[in-house]
């Protein structure tokens, strides 16, 4: 079954609030659409209230509380406020796991947040890949959204078949394609396309397991690296393990090796308390 057919047949799709959808669409031209994005945040009372609560939480760590979106922008900068607003809208969908498995939903959201923090660090170390920070952060947050769709599309027997193939050594993507005909990356990209998201978000979601690095590396390479880094959190980190899961040609295309991995893991490890708090608060 093709990815677009899977998305079309699932009735219980992830739901993104209208204000968040508008913010995502404005990422098409993030620099030009700054005022429009700020207007969306300010004119949505629910989003503004959630944003101020998050800004005043321990996850952000401001020295004094802010009482308005304007104050939040003054202290944090617009790009950071935009990222926080997007995370609030996206988190509501990714935290929810269909069929009652709330624990899995929280784990998926936590992994997505770790990946978003990781891609921000990686992008700062690889200036050759020209990417807008809010776009990179948001793409990383949404890279696994297709898993929510597949969890609704797959029957219990199909889920068991996917698990069986993974236990036999296949990757999750290969197992999903073998059982249903498409993997979560393809399905997630189709979902974003149905929401009329910009190509800058769809491409890295579609290719985060098969990143595009020819003729030049793009955001899918950074999200791929960040996803692999995020999976190293909580396990024995190091290049020996990392090199077995990463696309080494993609990593080489941006000069990402053992030295860069060690730096990112050390920096990200020092931020994990903040990451954990953010995942809980957003």
What are these regions (language model features)?
Residues 1-5, 248-282:
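Terminal helices and disordered tails flanking the catalytic cores of nucleotide-processing hydrolases
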Residues 1-246, 282:
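Conserved alpha-helical "signature site"
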């Amino acid at each position: 079954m093709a990815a677009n057919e899977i998305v079309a047949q699932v009735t219980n799709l992830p739901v993104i609030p209208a204000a968040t959808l508008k913010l995502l669409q404005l990422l098409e031209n993030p620099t030009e659409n700054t005022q429009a994005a700020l207007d969306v945040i300010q004119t949505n009372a629910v989003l503004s209230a959630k944003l101020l609560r998050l800004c005043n939480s321990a996850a952000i760590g401001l020295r004094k509380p802010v009482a308005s979106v304007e104050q939040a922008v003054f202290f944090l900068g617009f790009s950071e406020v935009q990222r926080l607003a997007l995370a609030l809208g996206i988190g509501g969908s990714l935290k929810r796991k269909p069929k009652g498995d709330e624990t899995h939903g929280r784990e998926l959201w936590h992994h997505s947040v770790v990946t978003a923090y990781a891609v921000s660090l990686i992008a700062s170390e690889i200036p050759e890949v020209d990417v807008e920070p809010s776009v990179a952060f948001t793409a990383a947050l949404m890279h696994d959204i297709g898993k929510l769709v597949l969890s609704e599309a797959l029957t219990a027997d199909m889920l068991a078949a996917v698990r069986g193939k993974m236990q036999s050594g296949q990757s999750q993507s290969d197992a999903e394609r073998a059982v249903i005909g498409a993997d979560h990356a393809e399905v997630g990209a189709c979902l974003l396309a149905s929401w009329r998201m910009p190509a800058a978000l769809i491409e890295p979601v579609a290719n985060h397991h098969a990143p595009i690095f020819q003729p030049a590396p793009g955001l899918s390479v950074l999200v791929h690296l960040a996803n692999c880094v995020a999976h190293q959190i909580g396990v024995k980190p190091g290049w020996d393990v990392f090199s077995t899961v990463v696309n080494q040609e993609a990593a080489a295309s941006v000069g990402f090796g053992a030295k860069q991995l060690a730096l990112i893991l050390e920096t990200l490890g020092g931020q994990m308390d903040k990451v954990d708090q953010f995942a809980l608060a957003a």
